[in-house]
Amino acid sequence: MTYNIVALPGDGIGPEILNGSLSLLEIISNKYNFNYQIEHHEFGGASIDTFGEPLTEKTLNACKRADAILLGAIGGPKWTDPNNRPEQGLLKLRKSLNLFANIRPTTVFKGASSLSPLKQERVEGTDLVIVRELTSGIYFGEPRHFNNHEALDSLTYTREEIERIVHVAFKLAASRRGKLTSVDKENVLASSKLWRKVVNEVSQLYPEVTVNHLLVDACSMHLITNPKQFDVIVCENLFGDILSDEASVIPGSLGLSPSASFSNDGPRLYEPIHGSAPDIAGKNVANPFGMILSLAMCLRESLNQPDAADELEQHIYNMIENGQTTADLGGKLNTTDIFEILSQKLNH
């Protein structure tokens, strides 16, 4: 079997971190004996510059045919038209591929806890995953309108939309430490009342998982005061957007965090959580670990290569523990150095 991978370098530092990661993929495929082919497509601001829109039909169709999609980063101050922004292409891609589940791990690596803005003893050992519903909720609800006197957004969830994301979270929790925290605002929001009801019903199918409920404001506090208590957190779109960004600063650098977006039966999208960082683009100083860890998620989830994913992740953990990092993590290496060291390790 030959896996079909679509590469979307995007904007800013996206091309350099993605292209370096693809060089690692070539080494890994030879080592673990699997085949793949890459289709490169412009996306985001780069696509606006070339084609006048952030996501062309050609790119979208290629993504629909793919086994996996790797995205570098998109956006930047260059693209200011509110009706034609790079981020709109990403929203359209998620919706078109029905990428309803966003998986965001937050891990404080051994040897890197001093980088956290929180006390070391508070964050050491943190290993949590936020499962965010990605294609419904207030970002997509209708009706919506805006004028100078009034604005309206609609927060709507159906039972089916809640059930499918909650099943993803329960299955993930069952494969980890068996603890699921469901986040809502059940004390005031009707949508959250349905959310909590559905979570409780679905929990009966997963007796091995312990479930607790937290209001979103309480969860935001506990993420700071005791992040180690969490295993898997599941929440609706808006809450997940905020909480996952909050959690991402716990390790001390946005450059350490990967993410994946899943559908039930189509291609999956893998990307680091950081932005395009146009201020450092092309300077060979970007931290590529988030992109490489996203590649590891892709190896495990879409390319059926769990051993390769484990090896790649372990090499990264060892590098971080030994201080072999870029400047944002307190190290002295540049982007190219990171890829060269990993290439040497993988070739052994």
Swiss-Prot record:
GO terms for molecular function: 3-isopropylmalate dehydrogenase activity; magnesium ion binding; NAD binding. Homodimer. Belongs to the isocitrate and isopropylmalate dehydrogenases family. LeuB type 1 subfamily. NAD(+) binds at residues 76-87, 275-287. The record marks Y139, K185 as: Important for catalysis. GO terms for cellular component: cytosol. Binds 1 Mg(2+) or Mn(2+) ion per subunit. This is 3-isopropylmalate dehydrogenase. Its main location: cytoplasm. The gene is leuB. It comes from the Bacteria. Substrate binds at R94, R104, R132, D217. Its cofactor is Mg(2+); Mn(2+). InterPro entries: IsoCit/isopropylmalate_DH_CS (IPR019818), IsoPropMal-DH-like_dom (IPR024084), Isopropylmalate_DH (IPR004429). Transmembrane segments: none annotated. Mg(2+) binds at D217, D241, D245. Keywords: Amino-acid biosynthesis, Branched-chain amino acid biosynthesis, Cytoplasm, Leucine biosynthesis, Magnesium, Manganese, Metal-binding, NAD, Oxidoreductase. SMART domains: Iso_dh. Its EC number is 1.1.1.85. The keyword Cytoplasm applies. Catalyzes the oxidation of 3-carboxy-2-hydroxy-4-methylpentanoate (3-isopropylmalate) to 3-carboxy-4-methyl-2-oxopentanoate. The product decarboxylates to 4-methyl-2 oxopentanoate. Pathway: Amino-acid biosynthesis; L-leucine biosynthesis; L-leucine from 3-methyl-2-oxobutanoate: step 3/4. GO terms for biological process: L-leucine biosynthetic process. It is found in: Cytoplasm. It catalyses: (2R,3S)-3-isopropylmalate + NAD(+) = 4-methyl-2-oxopentanoate + CO2 + NADH.
